[in-house]
From Swiss-Prot:
It comes from Homo sapiens (Human). Changing T172K: Decreases response to acetylcholine. This is Neuronal acetylcholine receptor subunit alpha-9. Na(+) binds at S191, D193. It is a multi-pass membrane protein. Belongs to the ligand-gated ion channel (TC 1.A.9) family. Acetylcholine receptor (TC 1.A.9.1) subfamily. Alpha-9/CHRNA9 sub-subfamily. N-glycosylated. GO terms for cellular component: acetylcholine-gated channel complex; cholinergic synapse; neuron projection; plasma membrane; postsynaptic specialization membrane; synapse; transmembrane transporter complex.
């Protein structure tokens, strides 16, 4: 029983395969006959219309498969496209009943007439025409030609907002030799097909609208139609933010810190020059990938502004260092500088001398209080205090002479002791004078150093605010 079922199944399979081979043989036979009949007297050199005054319509459809490269410096877009062209050939029609119902065949595209549709704004020396793939020929003469092509087109790149820029690249297709009265071109859809697009790592595609244009050129009076596909691109800016923008922001915030370095360290100017060199390197990196146009990119403007701030900070640092190292030969601090810088600005910026309390300058307040009290005393009381102090000094001088034996001794001993007293007095006066001069010199230098320190702190905060505001403005401009 099982053996009989197996024989029946084998017979059915053999019969079906035989019928399939017979059908394929019949199709191949009729296709060959159709091919011979169609191309017996056919010429692909002439426009396939029965009436030469009739316009041949060509429908164009573009499918964007991949963006291979966007060369901003040379302003060239390299794209991988699938190009579909559909037109009607009046000489390639047949009756399906005469060829066993055969309604379409596939033949090499170079055997039939093809519209000379080219990319008007191509930017390479090599041919960017579609590949010679087969065409699908239908019984009513409708020809469909699908072919891939790698195109290089010129694209005007606007780098004003780089790396947050949007670009619009046009792909303009049209007939090179036929005017609009001979071959008219239409777009199959309102936009290019993006269903098979492979996502690009650098660019986002936001659309590809298509528009038909009819243009009359100066060379010819006839109209020339074309179809322009506008590729809307938005740059993925993460790479440039991480590698170009964030390092620049961090480096720019280092520039104000040069004012915080002690002047005696000798590294203030070196830090500014080092930061300036780093910014120059980043500026050169941006210049290498940008086209040589008059539009300065947004990040380039940020670099230039930052470099200007760093240059200004370095120049001001040199000025402050000159103030810091004012020595004994320098003039005293002017009165206005004492009031504005040492009295008010130092308190606002929390700049104090070494050993002086930053929170509660107690001794300074006591000294100011005593000065105010003495200034309020009457003139008579001040005169009495001075006379009392003078009499006290004379009394102490008399006691010192008695202790040294200048009085109450014989004349020879008194003269000897008085000479020693005079020498001792002169030495003490000399030492006191030296100490006073040294203190005055140190006080003058300390005042200039404090002036320099206050100016340093003032410029540090000013430059911090400027860098912060500039960064916010750049980000807001990008948005």
């Amino acid at each position: 029983m099982n053996w009989s079922h197996s024989c029946i199944s084998f017979c059915w399979i053999y019969f079906a395969a035989s019928r399939l081979r017979a059908a394929e043989t019949a199709d191949g036979k009729y296709a060959q006959k159709l091919f011979n009949d169609l191309f017996e007297d056919y010429s692909n050199a002439l426009r396939p219309v029965e009436d030469t005054d009739k316009v041949l319509n060509v429908t164009l459809q573009i499918t964007l498969s991949q963006i291979k490269d966007m060369d901003e410096r040379n302003q060239i877009l390299t794209a991988y496209l699938w190009i579909r062209q559909i037109w009607h050939d009046a000489y390639l029609t047949w009756d399906r009943d005469q060829y066993d119902g055969l309604d379409s065949i596939r033949i090499p595209s170079d055997l039939v007439w093809r519209p000379d549709i080219v990319l008007y704004n191509k930017a390479d020396d090599e041919s960017s025409e579609p590949v010679n793939t087969n065409v699908v020929l239908r019984y009513d003469g409708l020809i469909t030609w699908d072919a891939p092509a790698i195109t290089k087109s010129s694209c005007v790149v606007d780098v004003t907002y780089f790396p947050f820029d949007n670009q619009q690249c046009n792909l303009t297709f049209g007939s090179w030799t036929y005017n609009g009265n001979q071959v008219d071109i239409f777009n199959a859809l309102d936009s290019g097909d993006l269903s098979d697009f492979i996502e690009d790592v650098e660019w986002e595609v936001h659309g590809m609208p298509a528009v038909k244009n009819v243009i009359s050129y100066g060379c010819c009076s006839e109209p020339y139609p074309d179809v322009t596909f506008t590729l809307l691109l938005k740059r993925r800016s993460s790479f440039y933010i991480v590698n170009l923008l964030i390092p620049c922001v961090l480096i720019s915030f280092l520039a104000p810190l040069s004012f915080y370095l002690p002047a005696a360290s000798g590294e203030k100017v070196s830090l500014g020059v080092t930061i300036l060199l780093a910014m120059t390197v980043f500026q050169l990196m941006v210049a290498e990938i940008m086209p040589a146009s008059e539009n300065v990119p947004l990040i380039g403007k940020y670099y230039i502004a930052t470099m200007a701030l760093i240059t200004a900070s370095t120049a001001l640092t040199i000025m402050v260092m000159n103030i810091h190292f004012c020595g004994a030969e320098a003039r005293p601090v002017p009165h206005w500088a004492r009031v504005v810088i040492l009295k008010y600005m130092s308190r606002v910026l929390f700049v104090y001398d070494v050993g002086e309390s930053c929170l509660s300058p107690h001794h300074s307040r006591e000294r100011d209080h005593l000065t105010k009290v003495y200034s309020k005393l009457p003139e008579s009381n001040l005169k009495a205090a001075r006379n009392k102090d003078l009499s006290r000094k004379k009394d102490m001088n008399k006691r010192l002479k008695n202790d040294l034996g200048c009085q109450g001794k014989n004349p020879q001993e008194a003269e000897s002791y008085c000479a020693q007293y005079k020498v001792l007095t002169r030495n003490i006066e000399y030492i006191a004078k030296c100490l006073k001069d040294h203190k005055a010199t140190n006080s003058k230098g300390s005042e200039w150093k404090k002036v320099a320190k206050v100016i340093d702190r003032f410029f540090m905060w000013i430059f911090f605010i400027m860098v912060f505001v500039m960064t916010i403005l750049i980000i807001a401009r990008a948005d």
